[in-house]
From Swiss-Prot:
Physiological role: Catalyzes the attachment of glutamate to tRNA(Glu) in a two-step reaction: glutamate is first activated by ATP to form Glu-AMP and then transferred to the acceptor end of tRNA(Glu).
Matches recorded under PANTHER family: GLUTAMATE--TRNA LIGASE, GLUTAMATE--TRNA LIGASE, MITOCHONDRIAL-RELATED
Protein name, per record: Glutamate--tRNA ligase
Record has Metal-binding as a keyword: yes
Quaternary structure annotation from Swiss-Prot or TrEMBL: Monomer.
Pfam families documented for this protein: Anticodon_2 (PF19269), tRNA-synt_1c (PF00749)
Record organism: Leptospira biflexa serovar Patoc (strain Patoc 1 / ATCC 23582 / Paris)
Entry keywords, A to Z: Aminoacyl-tRNA synthetase, ATP-binding, Cytoplasm, Ligase, Metal-binding, Nucleotide-binding, Protein biosynthesis, Zinc
Motif ('KMSKS' region): 250-254
InterPro entries: aa-tRNA-synth_I_cd-bd, aa-tRNA-synth_I_codon-bd_sub2, aa-tRNA-synth_I_CS, aa_tRNA-synth_I_cd-bd_sf, Glu-tRNA-ligase_bac/mito, Glu/Gln-tRNA-synth, Glu/Gln-tRNA-synth_Ib_cat-dom, GluQ/Sye
Molecular function in Gene Ontology: ATP binding; glutamate-tRNA ligase activity; tRNA binding; zinc ion binding
Length: 517
């Protein structure tokens, strides 16, 4: 049985966004499910756009997502080099073969000449197809042009036929090659075109399955024609559905497209991101959504992918006035956080992951988010028992680990003050002073240790004072935190303990100049 070999082949011209990451994941999961190999290949033939910085970001993104490649940059393998700019000599060898066999030819048409023909076709309302002007040049004519060092491209001589793409997701799709024309396979700078290099690379690297986004479906007939011209065996093709935002439109910088590393910095785990992205266009056999890596790798099959667009629901739908001004690529992490959809499937998965994961694992994952946390240095270690105790108590409230530091900081506050006059007035107005005095008495006289015990104590204060809702809870929040908004009080109180609670209330009451007795 032939070994399954898949590949992810990004261009290093930007960050790795969700669409590209999903493509990588589908290839990775399919290879693992079939006990095959997952390759990484860097397609940097567009020298104007390719950068070393982007290359490094792509590698960092894949490593964070936990998608280790079996062959590729940094790993090596028997089918390298795995960077296209290092394979130019290989492409030239195959190009010479095509030209010799009259399956390709040099084209000396100038850019201005071709642009004029394109404009003419546009004016007539017909698609532009190269007219084959250079396809029948004599050897003498070609030699003369080469001697003059006239720049040229190399075009593939497209045979007229019906090309059928037998796609594992989209089904059978037919294309008429005469509508494609003789397309460029080598650019004037000597670098191969995308559609040309990818075929040679896939063939020599023994790729058996090409899994990518549906946007590449229109490229596939060109690639099939090149496969056939060389006599290479065809891989299986699978084109995954488009990913759209909450507005139903294709992901873009105006509709939620951003680097996958932004989700790391927002506090999502790589496990959660893998799980979420796997469901962008694919469903498990039993309909299960929250899945471990082992489960995903055991049941993933591209033939269960849908043709329908997959909705990326992580960000809220932008308001009309925001659509032109908001650029997700340029937003800071805090800026991105403001647009997160609190009811997204990613948040649900992330909360479940945080609740279910071993607390020691969470503690280590939390460490990067504690660097700027206003707590003693000793507590910035994910192994600190007291830190883990706090994290264990509040984890149920977290959708992202970046939300944990405020809880932790609150626990360590020593010298409290009121954040503003609004917080002060919560205690001073109405029955505020009566509420806080009664709560102080109950806390000081009782041994309260659990969130439920503190809930009961606040309810008891309500019965005694006749206050409820905002006029009950807000004065208590103000006298214990100095703030008008914040964390879940019962959880906070149980973490602080009786001694700190009493000290806090006495400290803030002193600032107001009121008695709690």
């Amino acid at each position: 049985m032939t070994e399954v070999r898949t590949r992810f082949a990004p261009s290093p011209s930007g960050f790795l966004h969700v669409g590209g990451a999903r493509t990588a994941l589908f290839n990775y999961l399919y290879a693992k499910a079939k006990k095959g190999k997952f390759l990484l290949r860097i397609e940097d033939t567009d020298q104007d756009r390719s950068t070393e910085a982007s290359f490094k970001i792509i590698l960092e993104s894949l490593k964070w997502l936990g998608m280790e490649w079996d062959e590729g940059p940094g790993v090596g393998g028997p089918n390298g080099p795995y960077t296209q700019s290092e394979r130019i000599h290989i492409y030239k060898e195959y190009t010479d073969k095509l030209i010799q066999e009259k399956k390709a030819y040099r084209c000396f048409c100038t850019a201005e000449e071709l642009e004029g023909k394109k404009k003419q076709a546009d004016a007539m309302g017909i698609p532009y197809i190269y007219d084959g002007k250079c396809s029948d040049l004599s050897d003498a004519e070609i030699g003369s042009q080469l001697e003059k060092k006239i720049p040229f491209t190399v075009r593939f001589k497209t045979p007229h036929k019906i090309v059928i793409v037998d796609d594992m997701i989209q089904g059978k799709v037919k294309f008429e090659s005469k509508l494609i024309g003789d397309f460029i396979i080598v650019k004037s700078d000597g670098f191969p075109s995308y559609n040309y290099a990818v075929v040679i690379d896939d063939a020599l690297m023994k790729i058996t399955h090409v899994i990518r986004g549906v946007g590449h479906l229109s490229n596939t007939p060109r690639q099939i024609l090149i496969f056939e011209a060389f006599g290479f065996p065809l891989p299986r093709f699978a084109h995954a559905s488009e990913i759209v935002g909450t507005d139903g439109k294709k992901l873009s910088k105006r509709a939620g497209a951003t680097s996958v590393l932004a989700f790391r910095d927002l506090g999502y785990s790589s496990e959660t991101m893998r799980n979420y992205m796997a469901l962008l266009g694919w469903t498990s056999p039993d309909g299960k959504e929250y899945m471990s890596d082992e489960e995903l790798c055991s049941v993933f099959d591209v033939e269960r992918c849908s043709k329908s667009p997959a909705t990326f629901d992580v960000f809220k739908k932008l308001k009309e006035e925001e659509k032109e001004s908001v650029d997700f690529n340029k937003l800071t992490i805090l800026g991105l956080a403001e647009y997160l959809n609190p009811k997204s499937k990613l948040n649900w998965m992330s909360n479940k992951y945080i609740r279910d994961t071993k607390i020691e694992t969470l503690g280590k994952a939390l460490e990067p988010f504690l660097k700027d946390c206003q707590i003693p240095e000793a507590f910035k270690s994910g192994e600190n028992p007291q830190l883990l105790s706090i994290l264990d108590s509040v984890r149920v409230y977290l959708d992202r680990l970046i939300q944990a530091p405020p809880y932790i900081e609150e626990f360590f506050l020593e010298n409290l003050s009121f954040e503003n006059d609004e917080a002060k007035q919560l205690v001073l107005e109405g029955k505020g002073k009566e509420v806080v005095a009664e709560f102080y008495r109950i806390v000081k006289e009782s041994s309260l240790t659990t969130p439920d015990a503190y809930k009961e104590s606040m309810a008891k204060v309500g019965e005694i004072t006749g206050e409820k809702g905002r006029t009950l809870f807000m004065p208590i929040r103000a006298i214990t935190t100095g703030k008008s908004h914040g964390l879940e009080l019962p959880i906070l109180f149980s973490l602080l303990g009786q001694e700190k609670m009493v000290k806090r209330m006495e400290q803030l009451a002193g600032i107001l100049g009121i008695s709690l007795r």
